[in-house]
Curated annotation (Swiss-Prot):
GN (gene name): cysA
MF (Gene Ontology): ABC-type sulfate transporter activity; ABC-type thiosulfate transporter activity; ATP binding; ATP hydrolysis activity
Name listed for the protein in its UniProt record: Sulfate/thiosulfate import ATP-binding protein CysA
Keyword Zinc: no
Known function: Part of the ABC transporter complex CysAWTP involved in sulfate/thiosulfate import. Responsible for energy coupling to the transport system.
Protein's membrane topology: Peripheral membrane protein
Family: Belongs to the ABC transporter superfamily. Sulfate/tungstate importer (TC 3.A.1.6) family.
Enzyme class name: translocase
Organism of this sequence: Caulobacter vibrioides (strain ATCC 19089 / CIP 103742 / CB 15) (Caulobacter crescentus)
Domain of life: Bacteria
Principal subcellular localisation of the protein: membrane
Amino acid sequence: MTIAIRSVEKQFGRYPALNKVDLEIADGELLALLGPSGSGKTTLLRTIAGLEFPDAGQVLFDGQDVTYASAAARRVGFVFQQYALFKHMTVAKNIAFGLDVRKGKDKPSKAEIARRVEELLKLVELEGLGGRYPSQLSGGQRQRVALSRALAVQPSVLLLDEPFGALDATVRKSLRRELRRVHDATGVTTIFVTHDQEEALELADRVAILNNGRIEQIGTPDQVHDAPETAFVCGFVGEANRFDGQVSGGRFKAGALTVPASALKDGAATAYVRPHDFALDEAGFEVLIERAQVQGALTAVTALTSDGRRLEISASRADADRFTGAVKIVARKAHVYAA
């Protein structure tokens, strides 16, 4: 199922939740909607689902206008953060619910429903737990049941709203891998909302970065991290050290930092340097090391510049002993934007 969002607008009172949003989603794609609270990502997801209707613009499924069609007519599967499972029903009954409530010729036989439930239990690795109740499951298991229930009706689109937000970090990591595996096995077009950068960059084929009701950038995880198109994306995705300064003659300068900025006109600008883009170099500027902490294969370094600016630097574990006292560093790469 392909999805096209064309110039969609949505306003709540005076608040513009979506501002002329355009988005094309390919058949079978796994897309993340990433942004801070209030950016419009959940409103966009609900508009795709048919749970909200836009004030202007179009929503197309496979080229057909579904802008004002109901959620049921769109055949979407929805997974919420809080699972929304029926406590009085077994796991199997929860998964089968969407099939059980169908009417007439649309309703599968009991044998077909039972077979579908078993297929899904196997898919999400919950075989043998169909007779349990939600209260007897862990948070991660309950979220797998919610995912299975959404898939049971064979939706044209699977939508997930902060699906792992209520779970602890270890379980979230495990379920991220699980969702990717399930997506690849089913091939269903999938869109999920998250404010977790790591989650979006690890899971998605592409990531749409939202801010103030607009899409700032859409691209692969590598593209939005390594080639951010706006200052907001650069500051929001991944870690970055921010420098406010001036561009003059194709060079950006802020304190001791000087980097190329040939594409910008003279004037105020902001530069961002990723922690891993700093390197030790005697030709660079001096910083005083506050702290160097080995973290697995890397060393996390905090340093102070001569003007009191605190920098975060990421280096290899092998270089840990070199980050002590006063050292000189250079920025091998910087992203510079006009103010």
